[in-house]
Design a protein with these regions (language model features):
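Beta-strand-rich modules
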Residues: 102-126
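Recognizes extended acidic, P/S/T-rich segments that occur
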Residues: 74-110
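Acidic Gly/Asp/Thr-rich repetitive segments characteristic of extracellular carbohydrate-active
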Residues: 139-180
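Pro/Thr/Ser/Gly-rich low-complexity, intrinsically disordered linker/stalk tracts
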Residues: 27-70, 123-141
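Feature marks extracellular polysaccharide-active and adherence modules
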Residues: 174, 195-197, 221
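C-terminal motif of bacterial Sec signal peptides marking the signal peptidase cleavage site
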Residues: 21-25
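Extracellular beta-strand-rich solenoid/capping regions of secreted or surface-exposed proteins
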Residues: 180-193, 203-225
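Bacterial N-terminal signal peptides that target proteins for export
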Residues: 2-14
Length: 225
């Protein structure tokens, strides 16, 4: 009986000691009002060295970048650059972001550019970055080949047969270029996208015998015939 009583008292005593130690550890190791301070002070900051744009496959893309110590935040813009001379903002331009990621809407067959600039921190006397980090991003299928301006398209594919591929192939015509096609182009069982430039369509002139043949699907985009 006494042994059981002693063991129970001992157990309660140990539990109390552990609880006190845990509480003390929490109060010493954490202060909910404390703030973390960077060691980077009185510095000219640089923009992030690594910017990643990831397609979420749901009509959006996430822009991520590495932390720049001593920063007071980041200035982020995302542009449609189908026409590089007339960048179109997607979402808020020069958005202030207190973090390392942001999400934007995206569309098919579009070229984009993400810009991330580090902002200064007055408390640490750190100066903002002079230039933004830039990252190109596209929702275009990767180009398999680009057909030179002035080429007969049928002759091009005779000289450059389609590779064996289980994935869709994409062939580009040069923006504003002119082309001819005077014979049959047979893509067989390969899925192909045949495209020009969204802003400055190339033009293809068909001869009497010209036609495309496919049994796997052909997408023709941004080309005038």
């Amino acid at each position: 009986m006494n042994k059981h009583l002693f063991s129970r008292r001992k157990m309660y005593g140990l539990a109390f000691v552990v609880a006190v130690l845990l509480f003390s550890g929490c109060t010493i190791g954490y202060d909910e009002n404390a703030t973390w301070t960077s060691n980077v002070k009185n510095a000219q900051l640089e923009s992030p060295t690594e910017v990643i744009v990831a397609n979420n496959n749901d009509g959006t893309a996430t822009i991520k970048w590495n932390v720049v110590e001593g920063a007071g935040g980041y200035e982020v813009s995302f542009y449609n650059v189908d026409n590089p001379e007339e960048k179109v903002p997607v979402g808020e331009e020069n958005e202030f972001v207190d973090g390392c990621s942001v999400t934007r809407d995206i569309g098919d067959d579009t070229k984009y550019m993400a810009c991330v600039r580090t902002l200064g921190n007055t408390q640490l006397n750190n100066t903002e970055a002079k230039a933004a980090a830039e990252k190109d991003f596209t929702t275009l299928i990767e180009t398999t080949g680009t057909i030179p301006v002035g080429t007969d398209i049928a002759e091009y594919f005779k000289a450059n047969p389609l590779p064996d591929s289980a994935t869709e192939l994409a062939y580009d015509l040069v923006a504003g270029g002119t082309y001819t096609m005077n014979d049959v182009v047979d893509f067989g069982a390969r899925a192909v996208t045949f495209r020009g430039d969204k802003v400055n369509h190339p033009k293809v002139t068909f001869g009497e015998s010209a036609r495309f043949v496919t049994c796997a699907g052909l997408k023709i985009k941004f080309i005038d015939f």
